[in-house]
Amino acid sequence: MGQQQSQSKDEMLFQEVSNNNVEGIKSLHHEGAGLEGVDKLGRTPLILACTNDDLYDVAKTLLELGSNVNAYRSGCNGGTPLHHAAKRGLVHTVKLLLSHGANPLVLDDDVKTALEVARDEGYSNVVRAIESHICLFSGCMREYSGSSLLNLFAPQLLSRKVWVVVVPTGSRNPTKPLKLELVLYDSIQDAQPRMVIPLWKANLEEPKSFRCDDSVMIIDDSRSPKSMRQRRESGFISQARRWAQVDRQIRLKLAAEIKGDMKQMNWFSEACKGVPQPMNPPRFMKTSQATTTTTNVPALSDDALTRVAMSLPSPKTANKEDGLCVICVDAPSEAVCVPCGHVAGCISCLKEIENKKMGCPVCRANIDQVIKLYHV
């Protein structure tokens, strides 16, 4: 009898959710109604609330009462509450779920994250909301095309502004290191990207000095021959076919939106290597620490992002023993940044950085003064 009464209260809770009755939901929960029951369609009360924009207050109430923010519904139109809200373009509900610790990297039965669902449905506002929550980098950059010689003398004619983000991908196994992908949109208003490059299969070619060349080349090697037999056969192809094979690779050349913006280029390069910026880490790292709700899917943590950096090539650092400027890699390192105290480069390079207010090339701290050092 008690079980039948409990089930009846659970059914009444679904009715109150549909009726947008916040007080009725609180009353039933106080009387013992469960928050994780499922209806005939396999939906929890929170999933049901995340299918209608008018039920935002209901979703907020259920989360405050302790509903599982990552409850999973199986099926072709299933997933977590975040999947359901993203599929319907409910941007306010999406932000609410993310603020309560929703895991944006969970895959549904169609092997899609909520971000990919929002892209497919064309909801650019939802795409931006999720990307801003999980990205290691986002910003407007310049995409180069054409020959290097023309890029040198007329870059404005051969470059166009694009919106670029670096985000982690979804995985069935949350214990494995996260993988990153570079996503390129023609504009910030677009929901569907023009290009997606898996960074774990790509090569990042950086110039020795951003002072001489302010661009970065990303080469996608995912289409390269993988098997040993393919590698052996590739050694016998003609030179013409070899060039054709190279042309099929995705080669993306990007530069900062504002020419000479070393801070943006360093941020982008570090993000591609899986290194978050200490002053601006992805917001999902913060929410995962603040979330105490018990969930079926593990929330993201600092350890997860640490595994990203460990699974990617470590950033190249200047050899401190060679005594060369880390910027031009030519002149001796003879000047110190004040107040941070880093001996980071030659006097001319550091003076230029100081004038442009770019910050110390080592720690990004503001430079109040550059002092030349003399060896006695």
Swiss-Prot record:
Q: What is this enzyme's EC?
A: 2.3.2.27
- As recorded in UniProt, coiled-coil segments are none
Name of this protein: Putative E3 ubiquitin-protein ligase XBAT34
At the top of the EC hierarchy, this enzyme's class is transferase
Highest taxon of the lineage: Eukaryota
Enumerate the UniProt keywords alphabetically: ANK repeat, Metal-binding, Repeat, Transferase, Ubl conjugation pathway, Zinc, Zinc-finger
Which InterPro entries is this protein grouped with? Ankyrin_rpt, Ankyrin_rpt-contain_sf, Znf_RING, Znf_RING/FYVE/PHD
Which reactions are catalysed by this chain? Answer: S-ubiquitinyl-[E2 ubiquitin-conjugating enzyme]-L-cysteine + [acceptor protein]-L-lysine = [E2 ubiquitin-conjugating enzyme]-L-cysteine + N(6)-ubiquitinyl-[acceptor protein]-L-lysine
**Function in brief:** No E3 ubiquitin-protein ligase activity observed when associated with the E2 enzyme UBC8 in vitro.
- Start and end residues of each RING-type zinc finger? 325-364
Tagged with keyword Nucleotide-binding: no
Q: Please state the pathway this protein functions in, per its UniProt record.
A: Protein modification; protein ubiquitination
Q: Where are the ANK repeats?
A: 41-71, 77-106
Q: State the Gene Ontology terms under molecular function.
A: transferase activity; zinc ion binding
Protein's UniProt keywords contain Transferase = yes
Q: Which GO terms describe its biological process?
A: protein ubiquitination
